[in-house]
Amino acid sequence: MLKRLPHAVALALVVCAGMPAGMSACTNSTSTSSSGGDLGVSSILFIQRVTTIVDGSNITIDVAGGNGQVIDYTRYEPGGKLNILSPARADGVVTTLTRQFTTADFNGADVSFDGTQAVFSMMKDSSDRYHIYTVSLTANAQGLFEVHQKTAGDQDDINPIYLPGGRIAFATNQMYTPMGTRADEYEHARIVSQLATISVDGGDADRRLFPQNLSHSVAPFARYDGSFGYSRWEHLGGVNDVKIFAASPGGTNMVAVGGQHGKPCNSLINLHEISPNVMIGVGTERDRTIHAGALVQMDSRNHADPVCLDPSGDYTGHQCLDEEHAQFTVLTPNVPLNADPSPVGRYREPSVLPDGRILTSWADGPVNDLNELAATPPDFGIYVYDPVAHTNQLVYNDRNYWDLNAIAVVPRTEPPIIGDVQHTIASTTPILIGSVNLATTSLDETVSGAQFTSPVPLGVALQGAVAVRIIEGFSSEAAKGITQFGLTMDEGAAVLGTAPVESDGSWLANAPPYIMMHLQPIDKFGLAIRNQRLWIQGAPGEDRRCVGCHASRTGQGVPTMGGVPTVATAQQFTEAIPDRAEYGWPDKIQPLLTEKCAGCHNSSTTSYYSLTRTDPVTGAVTTYNIPTLDLSATPVTVYYDKQVHVYEASYVSLFYPATLAMGMMEGVTITGTVPPEWAIPEDARNSVLISKLNIKAADGTTAFPTSTNPFHPEDQGASYSLTPDERQTLIRTMDLGGQYWSRQNTGFVPYNSDPTAGQQY
């Protein structure tokens, strides 16, 4: 259970104050010898993190500490500091605010809107967890700074920032909801960080937990309108990147801000807003760059509306966020946007000075995994970057530490407060999802397969949608001991329900709060028209309806929710976890294939092709024989994603051709003829097996012409007939992602100590 600190008697700690002149004997201070210009502010706050640990004659060098990915956060080494540099120039004085925490490490910091206080994340020693603290930036009458601990408990709280109205946002790996702490759905080894807030005065007594994502949400930053942005690791099937989202301080209205529809790099991290909907941050590869990369500007303004281009304009009644057409400018063009060694170093954690200049950390050298291999940490110091001359002006660099997270200590305008109703609503209250008109879309995509013999625009295809399938996502937190859900990049999946599309194109559904979902509009044949590549979620009682299927949020005539009556009434899709429809292969699919298909398609009738792999370490050569079409339960051993697995022959036969097409089989040799892609994850309409079976709709029409695609196995005799439900079962297992494992066949047990059950959330 979470241990709370009484907010009225929050732990107060004091440290010595550093003075620019007449330094007291207890102050830990350093002056730089380099020359540099004035930053235009009196002080900057920054963090120091340790890379070299000396213990007697033993020296340990920690470059990334296993935190190779930009969203990782658990790199602890003792001896870090939270400092102020004052005056904010190269000959200024460094004062350590956390001097008595000699074994601490720090994980994010921010300065209050009035410039009098800082918030930071600190892990005091190796037996502690990262928690949130505040510190006064003005010494009291005794010449001391006061530190107050704001969070506690058996979880890590990191990356804190100030929000309007006296709140603090941060990322946490606290367990909540029956699913517990999420395990990232890509490597299944990281404890996923979610978003939360507390109040400055109340700390944990006012803790509120946000709707979840399947992978990390980190690095929040304040936005002009009172919301806050953050970096979100998105993994949904083939999507695997870090993009920018925003949310209200109450945990509602999670929306994309940029990077969803293209960006110059895989990952965007550590953004700060320069002006409304214009941000600077780091663009880089998701891993192998030590949280560093190129400086990138992202402009998510609606350029079609002149009002939105005025930084001081009144945006009331204007849709000024246009994430679909976000524009990117790489400010450091010589820095690679991938994980290649950099010829000019890499940047970390930029912020913005009042005059618009960029204050950032920078290190020379390759700044990638070559540093780890050579056990040579990059030397991050603090600089001002000139985007015109492409030069760095040194502010401060202590070569014994990484100098990070530099922020100007200066008052700034506090954004407006966004009202929060989440804490007044029961935690189990459903969210409302739906569309005004599903066929309304701004996406420039086409759909092909089945009845679409040639590609048609998405908007045209959506006019034939009869329902929307709502799919819950989960990862290995729900399937213990499972690191892959099968021969697929997709996560675990459960169908919450299928909502009908009404005559006006509308649909509505009530769905559980907090969990991740994505949507599939389906046609009269039960085939997905499109697979949404973005997780959506909502807080209890939240209205998350949309205009259409990714309809434009800008321009004239865009309807607003609540003002447009629709025919649809909300379907109830709030069943308990054991009652949700999952399609695990051993229990749902194999019995069907054994009964109806394996009599003709088995080990005695199939041909084989082979995959040969040479182990790069041992040199051992292994050959795997893959059946072309064996729909029996015969065990087959296969190699996939650097692991060896055993699955039923039917599962391997149907999905392995699509697995090979993913291009993830480096260092292997294929011998023989690979069959067609019988079953394609997320794409039943283009799967060869579905075209072989054919599908009949309720109106008697077929997905494929019967002249070329007679119904199978019915063409082999009535005794082999598949029912419509059996055909739909096969379609769903493909459209959901081709998962072998599910909660229902891995012994999932819900987490029962759910703190969101309290009304305070």
Question: Each predicted region: which residue ranges?
Answer:
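Sequence signature of WD/YWTD-type beta-propeller architectures
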Residues: 27-504, 510, 531, 535, ...
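Aromatic- and Gly/Pro-enriched helix-to-coil junctions and flexible linker segments
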Residues: 41, 77, 445-457, 463-465, ...
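Bacterial N-terminal signal peptides that target proteins for export
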Residues: 1-12
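Bacterial Sec-dependent N-terminal signal peptides
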Residues: 17-41, 558-566, 761
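General secretory precursor processing signal
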Residues: 19, 29, 323, 549, ...
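Generic N-terminal simple sequence motifs
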Residues: 2, 16, 156, 216, ...
